[in-house]
Amino acid sequence: AKAILLPVSAPSHSPLMDPAGERLSKELEKIGIMDIKYPVISNADADFYPSKDKVSSLLVKQLSMPVRWEESVTKALSSGTEAFIEIGPGKVLCGLLKRINREIKSFNIEDVDSLKTVQNAFKA
């Protein structure tokens, strides 16, 4: 395994987030989790959310557990994923994808222009 230092402003994905996890758990109890319509991979266990009943506990776990990024990407690829879209400023995740496999198609959406670029790429 290899660790990469990322510039972040919070101790995400570490035990220092346990108090936030407790608060998140209480908030998630107040809302209803809907049935899963689309496959989503949890970075807590690098597997698809099995049911709506497990969503809350996995969301809480991912706050304080290391991200299983490479395993999650591998799972997505083995399940037929052909492209990844990173939404938000920067291209950190697209860069990390290329470290796993330079052939992976990845796109970044951070503004209207990049959204149009991605839309055009998927029209073909």
Describe the residue ranges of each PLM region.
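Acyl-group transfer acyltransferase/transacylase scaffold of fatty acid/polyketide systems
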Residues: 1-124
